[in-house]
Structure formats: C-alpha cells, structure tokens
C-alpha cells in the first residue's frame, strides 16, 4: 500500500466523506436543525422516503474499506504472510499489516453505522460515535509507529498527517459528551477534509513529484515547502467549507421561496397591505381629532353667551 494508489485512494474517500459532512452540517446550521436526528427524515413520507433514511456515510465507509482491503491483499505478489518459516521466525510486511488493520476498522465502523441506523429499532448514537473514535485512536497509534523508519520529506509529510489525526481524535472524544454541538461537527468536518486532501498531496510528493525528480531529504527548503503546502491545504479547505455553506444557504432560500404556493404569497401580501392601510387610517383619524379639539374649546364660550 506504500504507493501512489495506496495514498490517493484513502485521500479521495476522506475528501468525499468530508464534503458530505460539510453539506449535512451546513444544512443543520441554516435550518437550525438537529445533526443526529434531522427533521427531513421524519417529515419525508413520500416515494423517496426510504432513500433518505439510508445510512449514506456508513455505506460509503463499508464500500471504501472493503475495496481498500482487497487492494491491500493484492499488493503483495507472494501473498500477505504473517511470519517467515525460517528459524528463528520473523514477522513479514509490518506496514502492510498496519494498512490492513486501518481498513478493517474503517469497514467495521461503517457496519456499525449501517446497523444502528437501518437495522435496529432505536438508533444508538453513542455506539456509532464510539466506533469512529476507536478507529481514529488506532489510526493514530499505527501512524506513530509507521514513521519510525522515515526521514526527511517523508517524515515531515507524515508528521503533519499525524497532527491532523491527533486533533481529530480530540474532537471526536469531546463529541462523546456533546454529540449535538455544532462547533465540534464543523471542526470535525474541516479536519476530515484536511486529512483527505493532504493524503492526496502526499501521494504526489512521495511517489509522483510534479518536477519528475524525487524530493531531496537533505535540502531544508524542501521541508519548509512541504509545511507551506500543508498551510495552503488548510486555507483551501476552510474556503471550501465557506463556499459549501454559502451555496447551501442560497439553495435553501430559493427552495423555500419556490415551495411557497402563489396563493399563500398573495394572502400574505394582502394581509400585510391591509394591516398597513388600517394603521395609517387610524393615525389620520387620531390626527383629525387632535386638530379639532382646540377649535371646540374656543367655540364653547361663545355658545354659552
């Protein structure tokens, strides 16, 4: 799995997952809706109601994890053996086994989400979040040991990835106690996007550099440029989330206006017009009464005489 496809495939999955999460979070922010129990699931009783209730993110994890497992098993020509038959025996393919462990946990996380949302009578949110947190904890441990024999540019690339995974672990752990906090979901989505885009960038840095020449580990400018690239990814992903929020806000505003019947719009217009006219009429009558009051007070002595 230590090749171009092995890095860009998980990166693509994380980017798509982050974009999906960004749309969900934007919708919840715009409509002031629940993130775990959105209102459209209970209101939608039409023809496509069952489609909306499918655990899309869970199935995405299951399919992506299964494909990555198959790819990892086929990467080793001799077969992914665990130990040699020599004496003393030695462990074989440690990094490949680490990759396989990551993808198995991703698949299990998706299975837990699918079962919780689509099979069980009552959704177990704590179980879903717990499975995700467990996967990220294991991912962090594997990545820390994954870079033991790395140096130079490769070490810097993976160190920045470890930083993102560590922050994601903290956010997901906090969500166990505050699962409906929107701020945590926004940060989580941003970190997923950053991790995915950085994995894709790492595939080009380590295996297919744009210049056609491998990066030199002993050149400090390369290390600095890698960090600069990472900062660019942070800014681009932040702008991407802002763009998704803006587009979602515009779409929901137009969608709501389009769904409002014409009759209701006219009724609202007439009601508002009649109300405004009635208020103006009341003000005019009150002003006439105030103007007539001094005249009546002046004419009253003459009438008495």
Curated annotation (Swiss-Prot):
Membrane topology per record: Multi-pass membrane protein
Q: Does the keyword Phosphoprotein apply?
A: no
Sorted alphabetically, the keyword list is: Glycoprotein, Membrane, Transmembrane, Transmembrane helix
List, alphabetically, the InterPro entries matched: DUF716
Where does the UniProt entry place glycosylation sites? 32
Cellular compartments annotated:
Membrane
Residues crossing the lipid bilayer are 4-24, 51-71, 100-120, 124-144, 159-179, 187-207, 223-243
Chief localisation class: membrane
One GO cellular component this record assigns the protein to is: membrane
Q: Which family does it belong to?
A: Belongs to the TMEM45 family.
The protein here is known as: Transmembrane epididymal protein 1
Originating organism: Rattus norvegicus (Rat)
Q: Which gene encodes it?
A: Teddm1
